[in-house]
Protein backbone atom coordinates (compact mmCIF):
# COMPACT_ATOMS: atom_id res chain seq x y z
CA UNK A 1 0.00 0.00 0.00
CA UNK A 2 2.83 2.39 0.95
CA UNK A 3 4.67 1.63 -2.30
CA UNK A 4 1.46 2.34 -4.23
CA UNK A 5 1.00 5.70 -2.49
CA UNK A 6 4.61 6.68 -3.13
CA UNK A 7 4.27 5.69 -6.78
CA UNK A 8 1.05 7.71 -7.08
CA UNK A 9 2.65 10.80 -5.51
CA UNK A 10 5.64 10.54 -7.83
CA UNK A 11 3.35 10.21 -10.85
CA UNK A 12 1.44 13.34 -9.80
CA UNK A 13 4.72 15.20 -9.26
CA UNK A 14 5.97 14.16 -12.70
CA UNK A 15 2.74 15.29 -14.34
CA UNK A 16 3.04 18.65 -12.60
CA UNK A 17 6.58 18.90 -13.90
CA UNK A 18 5.33 18.28 -17.44
CA UNK A 19 2.62 20.91 -16.94
CA UNK A 20 5.20 23.40 -15.66
CA UNK A 21 7.35 22.60 -18.69
CA UNK A 22 4.46 23.31 -21.07
CA UNK A 23 3.78 26.55 -19.18
CA UNK A 24 7.38 27.70 -19.45
CA UNK A 25 7.60 26.91 -23.14
CA UNK A 26 4.15 27.70 -24.56
CA UNK A 27 2.87 30.41 -22.21
CA UNK A 28 6.02 32.27 -21.19
CA UNK A 29 8.73 31.64 -23.81
CA UNK A 30 6.49 31.72 -26.90
CA UNK A 31 4.84 34.99 -25.84
CA UNK A 32 8.20 36.60 -25.05
CA UNK A 33 9.29 35.54 -28.51
CA UNK A 34 6.63 37.74 -30.14
CA UNK A 35 8.28 40.90 -28.84
CA UNK A 36 11.86 39.69 -29.28
CA UNK A 37 11.24 38.65 -32.89
CA UNK A 38 9.66 42.00 -33.73
CA UNK A 39 12.71 43.84 -32.42
CA UNK A 40 15.36 41.56 -33.92
CA UNK A 41 13.62 41.34 -37.30
CA UNK A 42 14.24 45.06 -37.85
CA UNK A 43 17.04 46.14 -35.48
CA UNK A 44 17.87 49.22 -37.59
CA UNK A 45 14.38 50.59 -36.89
CA UNK A 46 14.55 49.99 -33.13
CA UNK A 47 16.12 52.18 -30.48
CA UNK A 48 18.52 51.26 -27.68
CA UNK A 49 16.02 50.59 -24.86
CA UNK A 50 14.01 48.13 -26.94
CA UNK A 51 17.11 46.33 -28.22
CA UNK A 52 18.43 46.03 -24.66
CA UNK A 53 15.05 44.81 -23.39
CA UNK A 54 14.74 42.26 -26.20
CA UNK A 55 18.30 41.01 -25.62
CA UNK A 56 17.79 40.63 -21.87
CA UNK A 57 14.48 38.88 -22.47
CA UNK A 58 16.03 36.58 -25.05
CA UNK A 59 18.34 35.00 -22.46
CA UNK A 60 15.35 34.30 -20.22
CA UNK A 61 13.23 33.15 -23.16
CA UNK A 62 15.92 30.71 -24.31
CA UNK A 63 16.20 29.26 -20.80
CA UNK A 64 12.42 28.89 -20.44
CA UNK A 65 12.19 27.26 -23.88
CA UNK A 66 15.06 24.79 -23.40
CA UNK A 67 14.36 23.95 -19.77
CA UNK A 68 10.63 23.67 -20.50
CA UNK A 69 11.32 21.02 -23.14
CA UNK A 70 13.57 19.22 -20.65
CA UNK A 71 10.87 19.32 -17.95
CA UNK A 72 8.37 17.79 -20.35
CA UNK A 73 10.79 15.05 -21.42
CA UNK A 74 11.98 14.25 -17.87
CA UNK A 75 8.44 14.16 -16.49
CA UNK A 76 7.17 11.91 -19.30
CA UNK A 77 10.17 9.59 -19.00
CA UNK A 78 9.68 9.18 -15.24
CA UNK A 79 6.03 8.30 -15.71
CA UNK A 80 7.21 5.53 -18.06
CA UNK A 81 9.82 4.39 -15.54
CA UNK A 82 12.95 6.01 -16.98
CA UNK A 83 15.28 8.54 -15.39
CA UNK A 84 16.78 11.25 -17.59
CA UNK A 85 19.62 13.51 -16.52
CA UNK A 86 18.84 17.07 -15.48
CA UNK A 87 20.00 19.56 -18.10
CA UNK A 88 19.58 22.88 -16.26
CA UNK A 89 20.21 23.73 -12.62
CA UNK A 90 19.00 27.29 -11.93
CA UNK A 91 21.70 28.85 -14.15
CA UNK A 92 20.71 32.43 -13.38
CA UNK A 93 21.47 31.88 -9.71
CA UNK A 94 25.16 31.57 -10.63
CA UNK A 95 27.44 34.33 -9.34
CA UNK A 96 30.08 33.91 -12.05
CA UNK A 97 30.21 33.28 -15.79
CA UNK A 98 31.94 29.93 -15.26
CA UNK A 99 29.33 29.01 -12.65
CA UNK A 100 26.53 29.75 -15.09
CA UNK A 101 28.03 27.38 -17.65
CA UNK A 102 28.26 24.64 -15.02
CA UNK A 103 24.47 24.93 -14.66
CA UNK A 104 23.47 25.56 -18.30
CA UNK A 105 22.84 22.78 -20.86
CA UNK A 106 24.78 20.39 -18.64
CA UNK A 107 24.62 17.46 -21.04
CA UNK A 108 26.42 19.48 -23.74
CA UNK A 109 28.92 21.11 -21.39
CA UNK A 110 29.69 17.72 -19.84
CA UNK A 111 30.32 16.20 -23.27
CA UNK A 112 32.55 19.11 -24.30
CA UNK A 113 34.49 18.81 -21.05
CA UNK A 114 35.00 15.04 -21.28
CA UNK A 115 35.72 14.72 -25.01
CA UNK A 116 37.37 18.01 -25.98
CA UNK A 117 38.53 20.07 -23.00
CA UNK A 118 40.19 17.29 -20.97
CA UNK A 119 41.83 15.56 -23.99
CA UNK A 120 43.30 18.95 -24.96
CA UNK A 121 44.89 19.15 -21.52
CA UNK A 122 42.18 21.02 -19.64
CA UNK A 123 43.64 23.19 -16.90
CA UNK A 124 46.58 20.82 -16.32
CA UNK A 125 48.94 22.89 -18.47
CA UNK A 126 50.45 26.36 -18.66
CA UNK A 127 48.25 29.45 -18.57
CA UNK A 128 48.42 30.18 -22.31
CA UNK A 129 47.47 26.62 -23.24
CA UNK A 130 44.70 26.61 -20.65
CA UNK A 131 43.19 29.79 -22.10
CA UNK A 132 43.50 28.41 -25.63
CA UNK A 133 41.72 25.21 -24.59
CA UNK A 134 38.89 27.30 -23.16
CA UNK A 135 38.53 29.27 -26.40
CA UNK A 136 38.55 26.10 -28.50
CA UNK A 137 35.83 24.46 -26.41
CA UNK A 138 33.53 27.47 -26.63
CA UNK A 139 34.17 27.83 -30.37
CA UNK A 140 33.18 24.17 -30.85
CA UNK A 141 30.10 24.81 -28.70
CA UNK A 142 29.12 27.61 -31.05
CA UNK A 143 29.54 25.47 -34.17
CA UNK A 144 27.60 22.66 -32.49
CA UNK A 145 24.52 24.90 -32.48
CA UNK A 146 24.66 25.51 -36.23
CA UNK A 147 26.82 26.11 -39.29
CA UNK A 148 26.52 29.88 -39.06
CA UNK A 149 29.25 32.45 -38.45
CA UNK A 150 27.10 34.12 -35.79
CA UNK A 151 27.02 30.94 -33.69
CA UNK A 152 30.81 30.78 -33.94
CA UNK A 153 31.02 34.46 -32.90
CA UNK A 154 28.77 33.65 -29.95
CA UNK A 155 31.03 30.79 -28.89
CA UNK A 156 34.17 32.93 -29.23
CA UNK A 157 32.54 35.75 -27.24
CA UNK A 158 31.72 33.29 -24.44
CA UNK A 159 35.29 31.99 -24.58
CA UNK A 160 36.82 35.48 -24.39
CA UNK A 161 34.67 36.40 -21.38
CA UNK A 162 35.62 33.12 -19.68
CA UNK A 163 39.33 33.77 -20.31
CA UNK A 164 39.10 37.34 -18.98
CA UNK A 165 37.17 36.09 -15.94
CA UNK A 166 39.84 33.48 -15.19
CA UNK A 167 42.74 35.92 -15.64
CA UNK A 168 41.08 38.60 -13.50
CA UNK A 169 39.97 36.28 -10.70
CA UNK A 170 42.61 37.39 -8.16
CA UNK A 171 42.23 41.17 -8.77
CA UNK A 172 38.45 40.89 -8.56
CA UNK A 173 38.70 39.14 -5.20
CA UNK A 174 40.80 42.03 -3.89
CA UNK A 175 38.34 44.60 -5.24
CA UNK A 176 35.40 42.84 -3.63
CA UNK A 177 37.26 42.57 -0.33
CA UNK A 178 37.75 46.35 -0.15
CA UNK A 179 34.29 47.09 -1.46
CA UNK A 180 31.73 48.13 1.22
CA UNK A 181 29.26 45.72 -0.36
CA UNK A 182 31.56 42.83 0.62
CA UNK A 183 30.18 43.21 4.15
CA UNK A 184 26.67 42.58 2.81
CA UNK A 185 26.72 39.04 1.34
CA UNK A 186 23.15 39.29 0.05
CA UNK A 187 23.90 42.51 -1.87
CA UNK A 188 27.16 41.09 -3.19
CA UNK A 189 25.44 37.92 -4.40
CA UNK A 190 22.67 39.93 -6.07
CA UNK A 191 25.16 42.17 -7.90
CA UNK A 192 27.27 39.21 -9.01
CA UNK A 193 24.19 37.47 -10.40
CA UNK A 194 23.15 40.64 -12.25
CA UNK A 195 26.63 41.10 -13.75
CA UNK A 196 26.72 37.43 -14.79
CA UNK A 197 23.30 37.71 -16.45
CA UNK A 198 24.33 40.90 -18.28
CA UNK A 199 27.52 39.28 -19.60
CA UNK A 200 25.62 36.19 -20.72
CA UNK A 201 22.99 38.37 -22.42
CA UNK A 202 25.73 40.34 -24.19
CA UNK A 203 26.96 37.12 -25.83
CA UNK A 204 23.38 36.21 -26.71
CA UNK A 205 23.23 39.09 -29.22
CA UNK A 206 25.13 36.81 -31.63
CA UNK A 207 22.93 33.79 -30.81
CA UNK A 208 19.70 35.74 -31.23
CA UNK A 209 20.99 37.29 -34.46
CA UNK A 210 21.55 33.80 -35.85
CA UNK A 211 18.04 32.68 -34.91
CA UNK A 212 16.26 35.79 -36.24
CA UNK A 213 18.69 36.34 -39.14
CA UNK A 214 19.78 39.77 -37.91
CA UNK A 215 23.13 41.53 -38.24
CA UNK A 216 24.90 41.64 -34.85
CA UNK A 217 26.60 44.89 -35.87
CA UNK A 218 23.23 46.60 -36.34
CA UNK A 219 22.04 45.35 -32.95
CA UNK A 220 25.14 46.58 -31.13
CA UNK A 221 25.03 49.90 -33.01
CA UNK A 222 21.41 50.40 -31.96
CA UNK A 223 22.20 49.51 -28.35
CA UNK A 224 25.07 52.01 -28.21
CA UNK A 225 23.57 54.86 -30.22
CA UNK A 226 19.79 54.53 -30.40
CA UNK A 227 18.62 56.10 -27.14
CA UNK A 228 16.70 59.02 -28.65
CA UNK A 229 13.08 59.04 -27.61
CA UNK A 230 13.40 56.39 -24.92
CA UNK A 231 11.46 53.14 -24.67
CA UNK A 232 8.13 54.62 -25.79
CA UNK A 233 9.47 55.65 -29.21
CA UNK A 234 10.86 52.19 -29.82
CA UNK A 235 7.66 50.54 -28.62
CA UNK A 236 5.70 52.61 -31.15
CA UNK A 237 7.89 51.09 -33.88
CA UNK A 238 7.17 47.61 -32.52
CA UNK A 239 3.40 48.16 -32.44
CA UNK A 240 3.42 49.67 -35.94
CA UNK A 241 5.23 46.59 -37.24
CA UNK A 242 2.82 44.33 -35.38
CA UNK A 243 -0.17 46.13 -36.89
CA UNK A 244 1.23 45.87 -40.40
CA UNK A 245 1.91 42.16 -39.82
CA UNK A 246 -1.64 41.53 -38.65
CA UNK A 247 -0.71 40.30 -35.17
CA UNK A 248 -1.29 43.51 -33.18
CA UNK A 249 -3.91 41.78 -31.04
CA UNK A 250 -1.24 39.49 -29.62
CA UNK A 251 0.97 42.31 -28.32
CA UNK A 252 0.16 44.28 -25.14
CA UNK A 253 -0.72 47.95 -25.56
CA UNK A 254 1.08 50.43 -23.28
Could you tell me what each predicted segment is?
Residues 1-7:
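Positively charged, low-complexity/disordered segments
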Residues 8-252:
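Membrane-embedded transmembrane alpha-helical bundles that form the catalytic cores
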Amino acid sequence: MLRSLVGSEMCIRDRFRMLWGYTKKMVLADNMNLYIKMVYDTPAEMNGPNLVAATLLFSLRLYLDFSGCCDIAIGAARILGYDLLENFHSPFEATSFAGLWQRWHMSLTGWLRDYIYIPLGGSRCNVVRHMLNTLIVFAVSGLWHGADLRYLEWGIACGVISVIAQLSKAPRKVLWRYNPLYREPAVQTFLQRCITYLLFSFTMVFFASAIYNAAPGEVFAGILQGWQGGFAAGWESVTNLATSSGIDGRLPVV
